[in-house]
Design a protein with these regions (language model features):
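Class I SAM-dependent methyltransferase SAM/SAH-binding core
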Residues: 52-99
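C-terminal lobe and adjacent flexible extensions of AdoMet/dcAdoMet transferase-like proteins
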Residues: 209-251
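A short SAM/SAH-binding and catalytic strip from SAM-dependent methyltransferases
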Residues: 109-125
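A short glycine-rich, Lys/Arg-flanked "PGG" loop and its adjoining helix->strand segment in the class I
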Residues: 128-140
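A short acidic, Gly/Pro-enriched loop at the edge of an enzyme's catalytic core
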Residues: 100-110
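Conserved class I S-adenosyl-L-methionine
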Residues: 1-51
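SAM-dependent methyltransferase
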Residues: 145-215
Length: 251
């Protein structure tokens, strides 16, 4: 159920960091933070959808000043409860339109969106607005990095629109795609040991790499790098995800 925290209320925030998914593994977080620290180049970083600080906190420990934008107060409270969480500034709001005052500390050398978070913006207009918002916060030469999946439409059998992506003895999850609008919804079903079930759904809008490049162009940014992941392996037709970096021209 959606509330003022969007789809990431207290129930989600409480268990968010207990995920066993690949993006939550320490070695993956370390690689992610290493690349982001290099892209920041000694400047400030802006995380869109900072959440519980999974990436922001270790990045800050590397000496990179981090500020976040986050809609969910519950997720921010989770970050505040962690060591170092109180020191990170957060602006509460939609990261497509929320602005950060840069008059005191200057513009950012890096903005970033990880773990498919660009897809939480459920319209093309909002995704374009996000790029423009980022461009307004970046210093000349600054970078915008996005980690996002490549839409898995090749997995959908002809005539179907459902792709399961998780099954276990206590739960399952699947995505329902609308290939006309590029809208999709992830459905999560869980059953406790005593047989009590729960379900939640999260909508998103999937987006293609070339579409992201056009959004960047509309915002005055240009593609600098695109990799298969944080190990900087080449992006190919078989890549299931990509890390893309766009740059704000110096002049």
């Amino acid at each position: 159920m959606i509330d003022e925290d969007g789809y990431f209320g207290e129930d989600v925030a409480e268990r968010y960091d207990r995920s066993s998914g690949p993006s939550f593994q320490p070695d993956v977080i370390e690689r992610t933070v290493q690349v982001l620290a290099e892209l920041a180049g000694g400047g400030r970083a802006l995380e869109l959808g900072i959440g519980t600080g999974r990436i922001a906190l270790p990045l800050a420990r590397r000496g990179v000043p981090v500020h976040g934008i986050e809609l969910s107060r519950a997720m921010v409270a989770g970050m505040r409860a962690k060591p170092g969480g109180e020191a990170i500034g957060v602006s509460i709001g939609d990261f497509a339109t929320t602005t950060v005052d840069t008059r005191a500390d200057g513009a950012f050398s890096l903005a970033y969106l990880v773990f498919n978070t660009i897809m939480n913006l459920t319209s093309q207009e909002a995704q374009v607005a996000c790029f423009r918002n980022v461009a307004a916060h970046l210093e000349p030469g600054g970078c915008f990095a996005i980690e996002v999946m490549v839409p898995e439409l090749r997995k959908i059998p002809a005539g179907q629109n459902i792709v399961p992506f998780h099954t276990s003895p206590t739960g399952w999850a699947y995505t329902v795609y609308d290939t006309v609008t590029q809208d999709a919804t992830c459905h999560y079903v869980e059953v406790t040991e005593d047989g009590v079930g729960s379900a939640r759904s999260v909508p998103f809008r999937y987006v293609w790499p070339a579409e992201l490049d056009l959004m960047a162009q509309l915002a005055g940014l240009r593609l600098r790098d695109r990799w298969d992941g944080w190990t900087r392996e080449p992006f190919t037709e078989d890549s299931a995800q990509h890390v893309s970096v766009w740059e704000k021209p110096v002049s």
